[in-house]
């Protein structure tokens, strides 16, 4: 199945000059989602994680069913102030300014093997920050899995070389 046929390209969204890759048509198609889960499952099998970490918010959409499919736990990484209790956070650079991600401080006890899942790899800043956060929280980062990769933005170069990074759809 050619998953790219289920991705809609929307020019000038959210601002002029941006070509937005919309996964909503893919999410609406059960057969396409089954195929996404099959392919993400193969990546998961290759790295044998103990937990799936999903990045807010679309990482939740693909990470939770993957975790259920593989009988694994799911841990959300969220923006500041969204998680109850004690958290560990990491700040990371954006094009103009900084942002922050957080995880509950007890989410990765026991050094679990972690696969980070998200819908999109663009510049790699959010994914790299999540990888750092996983390590800071006590997890062993074993891989990244993305539905879409925008290759011209060079996000793969921001990720640790020693960790598997796979994308289901790549836009050159």
UniProtKB/Swiss-Prot annotation:
One of its GO terms (biological process) is adenine salvage. The keyword Manganese does not apply. It is found in: Cytoplasm. Pathway: Purine metabolism; AMP biosynthesis via salvage pathway; AMP from adenine: step 1/1. Keywords: Cytoplasm, Glycosyltransferase, Purine salvage, Transferase. Disulfide bonds: none annotated. GO terms for cellular component: cytoplasm. It holds the Pfam family Pribosyltran. It catalyses: AMP + diphosphate = 5-phospho-alpha-D-ribose 1-diphosphate + adenine. It comes from the Bacteria. Catalyzes a salvage reaction resulting in the formation of AMP, that is energically less costly than de novo synthesis. Homodimer. PANTHER family: ADENINE PHOSPHORIBOSYLTRANSFERASE (PTHR32315:SF3). Belongs to the purine/pyrimidine phosphoribosyltransferase family. This is Adenine phosphoribosyltransferase. It comes from Parasynechococcus marenigrum (strain WH8102). The gene is apt.
């Amino acid at each position: 199945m050619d998953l790219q046929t289920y991705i809609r390209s929307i020019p000038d969204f959210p601002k002029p000059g941006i070509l937005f890759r919309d996964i909503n048509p893919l999410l609406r198609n059960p057969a396409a989602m089954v195929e996404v889960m099959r392919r993400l499952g193969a990546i998961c099998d290759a790295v044998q994680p103990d937990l799936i970490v999903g990045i807010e918010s679309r990482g939740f959409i693909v990470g939770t069913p993957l975790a259920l499919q593989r009988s694994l736990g799911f841990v959300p990484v969220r923006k500041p102030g969204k998680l109850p209790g004690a958290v560990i956070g990491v700040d990371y650079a954006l094009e103009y300014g900084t942002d922050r991600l957080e995880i509950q401080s007890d989410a990765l006890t026991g050094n679990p093997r972690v696969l980070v899942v998200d819908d999109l790899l663009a510049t790699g800043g959010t994914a790299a920050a999540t990888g750092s956060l996983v390590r800071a929280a006590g997890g062993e980062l074993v891989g990244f899995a993305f539905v879409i990769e925008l290759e011209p933005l060079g996000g793969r170069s921001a990720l640790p070389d020693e960790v598997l990074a796979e994308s289901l759809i790549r836009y050159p």
